């Protein structure tokens, strides 16, 4: 069976942690930020982990 190809768009957006979880960046912080509070924009800069519901799907894209 041939090797699975990595989904390049996913590879650029997600990073695997040492424990095998996936890190991602938050959305809604790139533009239209004038109406958002400074606290909200600051919290959007932080990364977070991918939810368990999405892990199986993303694991297939990043073998």
From Swiss-Prot:
Name of the protein in question: Large ribosomal subunit protein bL35
Species assigned in the record: Finegoldia magna (strain ATCC 29328 / DSM 20472 / WAL 2508)
Example of a GO biological process term: translation
This protein's UniProt keywords: Ribonucleoprotein, Ribosomal protein
Pfam families per record: Ribosomal_L35p (PF01632)
Family, per entry: Belongs to the bacterial ribosomal protein bL35 family.
Entry keyword Oxidoreductase: no
Coiled coil: none
